[in-house]
Each structure stands twice: as structure tokens, then as C-alpha cells.
Swiss-Prot record:
Composition skew (Basic residues), residue ranges: 1-18
Region entry Disordered, spans: 1-28
Bias kind Polar residues: ranges: 19-28
Record-given protein name: Uncharacterized protein YFR012W-A
Length: 28
């Protein structure tokens, strides 16, 4: 659904979520 440009950014956010216990931060 998201453009390819956001694909790498999305992967980065997913990694941050694993480090951070706050899932809301990713959705923000």
C-alpha cells in the first residue's frame, strides 16, 4: 500500500519498535 520510497523507512520503524516496548510510537 505504501510507496516503495516508504518501504525502507517502514523497515527502520519496525526495527525501532523491537528495541522500544512502545508500539504506539511506530503508529504515530
Amino acid at each position: 500500500m505504501l510507496p516503495r520510497k516508504y518501504k525502507p523507512a517502514y523497515k527502520k520503524q519496525a526495527h525501532r519498535v523491537k528495541s522500544n516496548p512502545q508500539p504506539a510510537y511506530t503508529f504515530q
